[in-house]
Each structure stands twice: as structure tokens, then as C-alpha cells.
Amino acid sequence: MDTAGIRLTPKEIVSKLNEYIVGQNDAKRKVAIALRNRYRRSLLDEESKQEISPKNILMIGPTGVGKTEIARRMAKVVGAPFIKVEATKFTEVGYVGRDVESMVRDLVDVSVRLVKAQKKSLVQDEATAKANEKLVKLLVPSMKKKASQTNNPLESLFGGAIPNFGQNNEDEEEPPTEEIKTKRSEIKRQLEEGKLEKEKVRIKVEQDPGALGMLGTNQNQQMQEMMNQLMPKKKVEREVAVETARKILADSYADELIDQESANQEALELAEQMGIIFIDEIDKVATNNHNSGQDVSRQGVQRDILPILEGSVIQTKYGTVNTEHMLFIGAGAFHVSKPSDLIPELQGRFPLRVELDSLSVEDFVRILTEPKLSLIKQYEALLQTEEVTVNFTDEAITRLAEIAYQVNQDTDNIGARRLHTILEKMLEDLSFEAPSMPNAVVDITPQYVDDKLKSISTNKDLSAFIL
């Protein structure tokens, strides 16, 4: 697995995060250092490697200030498997709900997909060539071979030849005639020239097995996986366009071309050495002694999480994985509780603390304009597909930021997410009418913003429901 991103310096990591996330420099620095320490550890001898564990991070800050986005972007920068879980979804062992080990299994699933996607990209040309060969045969089929009547193990029991149904490869066919060869040659040429992309072709694809709905979450998942492995793969016939068929067939051939066992082992190692687990809402399982019954349950979840953070060997469908060198990032608003309300052992497993700042009007302005694909740029691009050009003035952007900030102060503070609802509401009419106004140019001014939003933003009751 190519993890060249891990060799980035902390400054380079922060620079890449700055392309997508505004502010929160302290948090960016801490995650950048944590990533660099992983690279430093990889250069040590084996004995030293085993002694050095990642320094887990606890992010403290209200919703919508960038906690999850920093962790997710960081993982993407270095090509590390990343999973986000919510602490409130877990329950103590023995109760209905997700057990804490499921977060590790989910991370391994992500790691397997990452590794296999990269390995499949290396054989994509060969897989596509095989897919094109198959498409030629499907578009100009030859006669199928008849079922063989030899080498059947039941023959001796019944005293005669029994058709060997189901044992021939479904792709086996009679040698093509000269006429078919000529047709296939012509079809191959047309395929290469892209002239048949919209033509329909029938292909056989593996049917997605149905889910078992009568069991609990974890039992359901484990039983489903076991049944999928035991039962033969059922194929169904579908009629699709040639371009879609090529993708389906190429993906299937790529699966056959890569070494699945080797990919699984590589994925397990990647999860162990590079995996990042983001545990959100960890403040919700902190105990503050207000409700003793709930406190017992919350402490149970914390104590179940603790061994995972300390280092446990977890059984997955791909093999065992050790969590000792995974990086865990806890996050929470800690409005009601405090980090000190976590059990002492769990506090000790998050030695790095970082407090994220609440967002100001200036931050909202920067969020709307600075990131690589900011919200303003997103809406401009979407409406441009309808040939509608939207121009936001600087004053209008400032007015949007002021309204978002004020609504956050007057109602629930949901941080930067408020900008999504504000922009969506403001552009609702324009988005609806855009298909019927090609080549239009719309200037978004402070007056336009106020016309669309002022009556709502100044009414606290309406703001709470609409914005």
C-alpha cells in the first residue's frame, strides 16, 4: 500500500489541511505531529517500535467547528484507513447494541477496501482488456457447448452415463465460425472507437445476498458473513449499457487478478500501523454523578473502550488485528461534563488535549471563501450546470456570515453547518427556477440576502425551525 503521505512534514500536513479547513491551528498542529511521529516510529528498529505507541488526542469543542473534518482530511492526506464512530452507539457487553470491538472490525473493512482498490488500479488495464474481450463475445455469441457426459462420479452407481450438468464453465462455447470471427473483429474495432457505449448487453452479475433481519446487530453481521461464505454465489442476468457492463466486468476480473489473501494481510497490517479511529460524542459517556443509574451504564462503556485503547487483539473475518499502535481521537463538546468526568484510566489514554475555538463572523467569511472548494464555489458550480451564473459580492458574503453567526447565538450553535442551511434557504427559489432561466446572471448582494432571509433570521421562533 502506497502511504507516501506519511512522509509529509508537520508543516506540509498543516498546509494541506489549510486548503479545506479554516482556523483551528492548534488542533492541526497536534494531529500533524501525531502523524509525523508515526513516520518516525517506522524508521526505528523492531524493539523500539514495539515500545512506542501513538499519543491519542482528545478534541474539545462545540459541534461544527471542524473536529471530524480535521481527522478525516488528515487520514485522506496520508492514505490511512479512517473510521468515525459515536460513543453513544455502544453499550456494555451483554446489552443490546453495538459492542466496542465493532469499531475495529469496521476499520479493518475500510483498510481492506483501500488496499484492494489500490491493487486493482495496478491491474486495471489488464482487467479492462479482459472485459472488452468478454463484451465482444457477448455481443456476438457463439454456440454454447453441450453438457459433458463423462467423468461423472455418479455414473458407476447408476450404471450409465449421466449428463454432467453444472460442472462445465458457463463461458465455454463451441469454436467460432469464420462468420462469427469476422463479426467479432468488427465489433472489437467499434468498441475501441467508443461507438457502442450506449448499446445494451446482457451480463451475469453476482446477486447481493439478502440481510438477516431477525437477529441483533452484531449477531446479524456475523451470521450474514458466515452464510455468505458457505452458500454458493448466485448470479442473475441484467441488461445494461456497454459502458456499464465494462465497469462491472473489469471490476470482477480485477478481483480475480489480485492475490486476495495477500491483500487481506496487507490490509490488516495497514489497519494496525496506520489506522485512525475517531470516537465522537465521548463526552456523552462521561459520568457527572447526576444520575447514578445512567452513570453505571456510561462507566461500563468507558471500561469496554479502555482495553481497545490500551491494545487488544480483535478477531475479524480477515484475521486477527492488534489495536496497540492505532491512533484514537476522542471528541466532544463537554458542555455538561468535563474531561475529568471520564474514568481516570481513560483520561490517561488521551494524553494530548486540544480545545477548538468557537467560530466568529470572520471565520464564517473565511469558510465561505477560502477552502479549495468552498460553499460559495460549490453553489456557483452547481448552478453553472444550468447555465446560470451567480456572483456573490464581498458584502453579501459578510452579511451571510453575520446572519449565520446570529442564528447560532439565538438558537443552537451548530457551527459551520449553519452556513449550509442559510445558503440552501437563500438560494431555494433560484435553484428551483434555474432550469427555466438559461444564460441568466444573478448578483447576490446584501439586499438580496436580506430579502430572502431577514424576516426569518430576525424571528427566533422561525429561525429555530427553518434555519
Curated annotation (Swiss-Prot):
Keywords: ATP-binding, Chaperone, Cytoplasm, Nucleotide-binding, Stress response. InterPro entries: AAA+_ATPase, ATP-dep_Clp_protease_ClpX, ATPase_AAA_core, Clp_ATPase_C, HslU, P-loop_NTPase. It holds the Pfam family AAA_2. GO terms for biological process: protein unfolding; proteolysis involved in protein catabolic process. Residues 178-192 have a biased composition (Basic and acidic residues). Its main location: cytoplasm. Residues 149-192 are annotated as: Disordered. SMART domains: AAA, ClpB_D2-small. It comes from the Bacteria. It is found in: Cytoplasm. The keyword Signal does not apply. The keyword Cytoplasm applies. Gene3D superfamilies: 1.10.8.60, P-loop containing nucleotide triphosphate hydrolases. GO terms for cellular component: HslUV protease complex. CDD domains: RecA-like_HslU. ATP binds at residues 22, 64-69, 280, 345, 417. ATPase subunit of a proteasome-like degradation complex; this subunit has chaperone activity. The binding of ATP and its subsequent hydrolysis by HslU are essential for unfolding of protein substrates subsequently hydrolyzed by HslV. HslU recognizes the N-terminal part of its protein substrates and unfolds these before they are guided to HslV for hydrolysis. A double ring-shaped homohexamer of HslV is capped on each side by a ring-shaped HslU homohexamer. The assembly of the HslU/HslV complex is dependent on binding of ATP. NCBIfam families: hslU, PRK05201.1. Belongs to the ClpX chaperone family. HslU subfamily. This is ATP-dependent protease ATPase subunit HslU. The lineage of its organism: Bacteria, Bacillati, Bacillota, Bacilli, Bacillales. The gene is hslU.
